[in-house]
Swiss-Prot record:
Organism: Tityus serrulatus
Name assigned to this protein: Putative sodium channel toxin Ts41
Keyword Iron-sulfur: no
Subcellular location, record wording: Secreted
Tissue: Expressed by the venom gland.
Residues that span the membrane, as ranges: none
Annotated domain remarks: Has the structural arrangement of an alpha-helix connected to antiparallel beta-sheets by disulfide bonds (CS-alpha/beta).
Keyword Cell inner membrane: no
Assigned protein family: Belongs to the long (4 C-C) scorpion toxin superfamily.
UniProt main location, coarse: secreted
Signal sequence coordinates: 1-23
CDD domains per the UniProt record, alphabetical: neurotoxins_LC_scorpion
Keywords recorded for this protein, A-Z: Disulfide bond, Ion channel impairing toxin, Neurotoxin, Secreted, Signal, Toxin, Voltage-gated sodium channel impairing toxin
Paired cysteines (S-S): 22-87, 39-62, 48-67, 52-69
Length: 93
């Protein structure tokens, strides 16, 4: 009985730790207005890398016809959020 409870507790702690480690890296599809950045060359390509650099992501590639960025945060997902945050423009100051 004690071994079963101990095993259950250890298993749950391991699962929580794995979820925490795996969920650290954010990512997603950057958006230009409400549309994604379309691409045709699946895999790594210069266009998606440039798009991800624009959105302050770490690395980009084409997946399922849209550019996908590793390390993309929620606040930098939309183009206008990035523009307002990083570009100097007297209209937004």
């Amino acid at each position: 009985m004690k071994i079963g409870v101990l095993f259950t507790i250890i298993s749950m702690l391991c699962l929580l730790e794995v979820r925490k480690i795996c969920s650290k890296k954010e990512g997603g599809y950057p958006r230009y207005f409400s549309f994604g950045y379309k691409c045709q060359n699946w895999g790594t390509n210069e266009y998606c890398r440039t798009v991800c650099q624009l959105h302050k992501g770490e690395y980009g590639y084409c997946y399922a016809g849209d550019c996908y960025c590793e390390g993309l945060t929620e606040e930098n997902r939309l183009f206008w959020n990035v523009y307002r945050k990083y570009c100097k423009n007297p209209l937004f100051d």
